[in-house]
């Protein structure tokens, strides 16, 4: 029942599930995907064709290919390590994007049609690293962990709550991303997302246990609950 999932004995897995669902979104993945065209335009890709091309390959292609990394290694090196390594890659790449936008803001004149600037190329490479890091970590691994930490009798409700929170966080990020860019600038916006990655890394390191290879009974033992 819904009452059971909020009982004290399931509080820890519920908080882990909700925390993972939130960090998956507030680290900026949907903001980057939704507004990739505007981001690349601001970075110096002046034509619609160039922006469409880099969006297709830098986001779509890399996202698909990197997901196979998670599939290949999730049962070999574990969920925690993939999450922690992915967040490092995401945080560093977002910090680099922020630094690139500082350089872009200090460069006089509009982007030229002759080609992207060095700062634009750095932005694309950093965002490729960001997308790849997300695709082998927070993207698929979050939902693997969420499905593993709940026992069968409350799993459906636990996953449903995590999904609702995830979509709520995605909505807020997508609604306020451009407003945040207007308010504090592109550089500080990406640095803020990098800070969220750092906070997420610390939280996962301290709070999220490894579930690789554990039976349902052993996972329940971690919560102090007898199956």
Describe each region flagged by the PLM.
Residues 1-227:
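Alpha-helical transmembrane bundle of multi-pass membrane proteins
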